[in-house]
């Protein structure tokens, strides 16, 4: 939760910073500034990772991993499959919601300059959700936390559809907590289902499933939006999110 929270701080601050620079100097300066910062960060990371300090011994890790069962090290195939399915729905629904949120607000009559604020407060709530839900999972358990966050996400989207612009802006940080909080709970659970020697592979597979769904979902829901409109699309999205509830219940005996 803490690790994911630190990363989401960037998601909360960058949209607001980009909106500020865009308002002062135009979107080209904002895009170029972001590109330069990212490039400098990449160079810094390259030199930091070049240090061999703390690297595990390769042959020993490989020989131990070969004794971990299947090539992926998944100790509970059913549990990993259920967890990955929930992650795919959760990640895909998050990218779809963030894609269509500006269009929903514009349809409600919001000004264009409010879009940066809307995304910023949503990401801020999401950053807090990563931190808060990680601690809630320790107290309530994984299943109960997922049930609460996914229910709150689905119902929150339906409520957002009915609200005018100003109340919707106040709802967005709360919705962001639920929308983004589930992922920190799911990430921590992967380690329990994969052998320690194969966790890099297990996490790689898990992230690939989620990122792939996150990339495919917006175009697919875009087709629905073209046919039925943004409000109907987000209502369908809320229904899809709620399908994670029975999946989370099935995860309990897994």
What positions do the PLM features span?
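A late C-terminal transmembrane helix in Major Facilitator Superfamily
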Residues: 11, 191-193, 197-230
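Helix-loop junctions at membrane interfaces in 12-TM secondary transporters
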Residues: 161-171
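Intracellular juxtamembrane helix-capping segments at the cytosolic ends
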Residues: 181-194
């Amino acid at each position: 939760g803490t690790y994911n929270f630190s990363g989401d701080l960037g998601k909360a601050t960058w949209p607001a910073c980009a909106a500020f620079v865009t308002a002062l100097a135009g979107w080209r300066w904002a895009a170029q500034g972001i590109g330069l910062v990212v490039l400098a960060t990449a160079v810094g990371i390259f030199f930091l990772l070049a240090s061999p300090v703390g690297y595990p011994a390769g042959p020993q890790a490989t020989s131990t991993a070969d004794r971990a069962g299947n090539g992926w090290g998944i100790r509970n195939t059913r549990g990993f499959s259920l967890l990955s399915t929930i992650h795919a729905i959760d990640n895909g629904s998050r990218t779809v919601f963030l894609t269509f949120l500006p269009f929903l607000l514009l349809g409600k009559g919001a000004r264009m300059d409010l879009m940066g604020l809307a995304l910023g407060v949503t990401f801020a709530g999401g950053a807090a959700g990563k931190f808060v839900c990680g601690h809630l999972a320790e107290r309530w358990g994984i299943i109960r936390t997922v049930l609460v966050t996914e229910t709150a996400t689905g119902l929150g989207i339906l409520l957002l559809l009915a609200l005018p612009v100003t109340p919707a802006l106040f709802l967005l940080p709360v919705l962001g907590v639920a929308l983004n909080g589930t992922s920190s709970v799911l990430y921590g659970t992967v380690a329990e289902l994969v052998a320690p020697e194969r966790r890099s592979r297990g996490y790689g597979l898990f992230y690939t499933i989620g990122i792939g769904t996150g990339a495919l979902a917006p175009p697919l829901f875009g087709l629905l939006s073209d046919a039925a409109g943004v409000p109907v699309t987000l209502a369908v999205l809320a229904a899809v999110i709620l399908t994670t509830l029975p999946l989370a219940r099935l995860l309990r005996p897994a």
